[in-house]
Each structure stands twice: as structure tokens, then as C-alpha cells.
């Protein structure tokens, strides 16, 4: 195993117009400050303020949006990063691990990854993801492509059907069909940063948001050694070359993860578990008294001095004493949040350091807060209560079903663009107006300029004389539609659906 030297991981070079030569500590910090500016000022971050965390289309400003959640994750990520660096300093290991002049970039990379971690999420969260994937599966039938060419291939797209004697073109068709049916917020985040917004972030900063390492076209089970790291798609076929370059620049193993990504993941886990419960109380799904009882009942055996006693019971007792003359709700969540952070942040830092060799190599096949400890049990307690009493609430389920219908409906509306032949769509894009295609012309005009330019750039790199041309053109056309719809905010998607369905 290679020695731990973070100077080989915190790569401050960029894909385009990268600074050259050696840099001082201050100059490297300025490079990552530039990353911060690019991220904070990006439209993708601003859109998070109109995407909700649990309750779509929520008008109550006290309930978290994706932006306020991401800011909370950012703060927790910073806390964990500082705790790790402080412990390494106490152990006199900063210089040994090549971090003595990289503490600032270490913190900044984690913070900005936390702020960005949700930028690829579509409207209506996981139900938006499910709607996109189900819609494409019902048209591309990727499982039909898993075998050899067959007469009953149900794929409705002629250029994507398998054909006898056309290997390896059939392999490309298989990859494309699988890839398009695996929309995932984390993979879309990578696509946003590189292909759509062209943010040109440092390799280290992008590496930190590559949460999962499975390509979206992967079929079959992942290797057991990386089953956790590959449990979801992490990037698309459209970003394959970029990710290959990223792995080279960051010295990552084929399915390995960037070391600081574990910190971002832990910060997200800690933040959303408490936040979802607080939002549920704000929405009057249950009272704070009922929440405490749910937590108490779900914990199981209660022993004096247990972690539950130190965190949840302590918060409950302090909130009942009302020493701060504030509402019981406010006090309970303040103490619960503080107690949770004070236990889980140091534990996350300790887990990171204790497993640093495997984490540095990128092959630690677990989350930091995924083990048989009471700390992991506490996190699971919060998650399970939310699953049982929040996400299954009729109001939440109704909103999720509405969101699923909105996204499915928008895909139906834009389907005429996907039904055009490669020749027709190419002509439409190049001329921007085709009298014989009035509906398709108007639908194309509704797509954002950024997404259309990304499509044009991608297809311009394909040789139109090859057999791959119609397959890859259709792939990028589907990406164009997915990019546009997934980039909408909850409210915009809702309003756009109502407008185009003429229900207003």
C-alpha cells in the first residue's frame, strides 16, 4: 500500500487553463478560494432554494429547502474536517501525511463538496429520479438488451435495438439503454459541474463530490470489495472520459473513492437525520412529545448512561425545564442537534483516522457512520423513525405521487422531440425552425440555451459517417431532455406542467 501523502490527492490543477508550476501554500489556498467563488455564485446553488428537502412545494419558510439543508451539511463537514486536522496535529501527523501546508484546502474542499452535494437532484427528490428512470425503462427496456439480439426486443427506438452481426455496436446500444435508465442525482451533479456549467473546478474539488464509483451503464452485481461504494450510479457515459482523467489526476483505483468524500457523506448523514424530524414537527405531522415517544420506543433496551440517554433523553429533560424561556420544540431540537453533533462528529473523525490507510487508497467499503457501534445505532434510530412516521404520512405520500406525475407528464410532453429521426432532429437544431414540425420547433425553443449548447458540443465530436452516430446522437438527445427537466425547481416543474397541460 502506498504511503499516505495528501499532496498526491489534493490536486489543485484544473481541466482547462490550469495554473502551472509549483505554488506556495498561499497560492494554493487562493486556487481553492476561486473554487469557492465559482460554486457559491453558480445558478445550480441558487436553484436549491426552490427545491425542498422532504416536503415538495412547501410555502412555510421554516421548513428546509435543499439550500438550507446544504448549508447545514457544509457547517457539519467543516466541523468534522477541523476535528480530524486537530487530532492529526495532536498526534504530530500533519507533516507525515503531507497536510502541514494543506489544512486550508482540506477544509475548503470538504465544505464546498457539502454545499454542492445535492445540486444534481431533480424536482421532487427521489420520486423525481424514479419518474425519470421508469419513463425511460418503459421505452428502452434495458433488460431486453442484456441478452443476445432477439425478435421480441421491446425497445421503441429503432437505432437502439440490438441487431444480429452488429457487435460491438450492440455493446454500445446496451450501454446507452442502461445508462439512460439510471438517472441519479449524484451522477447528474458531476454532469452539471463538468458538461453543463463548465465550472472548471480543481480535480480535488470534483473528486470530493464523486460519491459513488459505479458507472451508470454497469449491469450486474458490483464486486464485493466495493459493493458499498458502487451501490448507486456515480457518473454517466457522457462523462466517462472526464472521470477517467479524474482518476488519473487523483491516483484513484478503478472503483475507488476520493478520501475527503467520506467526510462529506458523514456530514450529510448527520444533518438530514435530525433535520427531517424537526421539519416534520414544524409541519405538525407529530408533536415534539410524540416524536420523543417514537424515539424512545424505537431505541429498544434502555440503560442508564446509554448514548440515547446522553443525547435524546438529555435534550428532552433540558427542553422540559424551559430554563431559556423558549418553546419546548425550539429547545428540544437545539439540544438534540448539539448533543448529536457533539457525539457523532468526534466519532466520525476517529473513524476517518482509524481507517485512514483504506480511506486514502479509496477502497474503504463503508460509510464512516456505518458499523455496529451505538453511534451508528443512533443515526439509524433517527432514520427509522422518519421512515415510519414521516415519509409514510399521507400528506407526504400524496405530494410524492403528485411529483411523480408531474415529472412523468413533462417527459410525455417533450416526447415528440425524442420521436424525431436523427436527420429531422439534427436539421431542427441547426435551423431552429421547421414549418412541417410546429410542435417540435416550439418544444425545442423551450429548452434552455445552456442545455442545447451542451448537446450541440457533444454531438459535434461524433463522426457522422460512423455506425455509432445515430446511437450516440440519440443518447445525447435523451440527456438533453433529462438535463432540462431535472434542472427545474419544484415550483417551476409544477407550473410548467400545469401550463403545458392547459389546466390553468
From Swiss-Prot:
InterPro entries documented for this protein: dGTP_triP_hydro_central_sf, dGTPase, dGTPase-like, dNTPase_1, HD/PDEase_dom, HD_domain, PHydrolase_assoc_dom
Residue span, HD domain: 66-273
SMART domains for the chain: HDc
Pfam families found in the cross-reference section: HD, HD_assoc
Any GO molecular function: dGTPase activity
EC number from the UniProt entry: 3.1.5.1
PROSITE patterns: HD
UniProt KW Nucleotide-binding keyword: no
Keywords, in A-Z order: Hydrolase, Magnesium
Group of enzyme by EC: hydrolase
GO biological process: dGTP catabolic process
Catalytic activity line of the entry: dGTP + H2O = 2'-deoxyguanosine + triphosphate + H(+)
Record has Zinc-finger as a keyword: no
Coiled-coil intervals: none
Matching CDD domains: HDc
Names of required cofactors: Mg(2+)
Purpose of the protein: dGTPase preferentially hydrolyzes dGTP over the other canonical NTPs.
Family to which this protein belongs: Belongs to the dGTPase family. Type 1 subfamily.
UniProt subunit comment: Homotetramer.
HAMAP family in the cross-refs: dGTPase_type1
Name the record gives this protein: Deoxyguanosinetriphosphate triphosphohydrolase
Organism: Enterobacter sp. (strain 638)
UniProt lineage: Bacteria, Pseudomonadati, Pseudomonadota, Gammaproteobacteria, Enterobacterales
